Amino acid sequence: MYGDIFNATGGPEAAVGSALAPGATVKAEGALPLELATARGMRDGAATKPDLPTYLLLFFLLLLSVALVVLFIGCQLRHSAFAALPHDRSLRDARAPWKTRPV
């Protein structure tokens, strides 16, 4: 059904049918001139590799976001009921493996 539209080997008339005017022509051009124009003056892979300021910016944004999350969690725990609970030393003593408990 869609074989004529997606067929890359057919001409432009096979792809679009009678949608174009009879006098209109579609000229297919390769991407080589575009690639040559954009690759002038660049090393191999230089367009895809970020530079040092980009790495520094990402590092500081990540550091800032981690610091904000840690600060937010610390403030939430400081003002919660969890911080007001008394410290139970008996739980810590019961978990100590070096102490022997009476049987």
UniProtKB/Swiss-Prot annotation:
Keywords: Membrane, Transmembrane, Transmembrane helix. It is a single-pass membrane protein. The chain crosses the membrane at residues 55-75. GO terms for cellular component: membrane. This is Small integral membrane protein 32. It comes from Homo sapiens (Human). It is found in: Membrane. It comes from the Eukaryota.
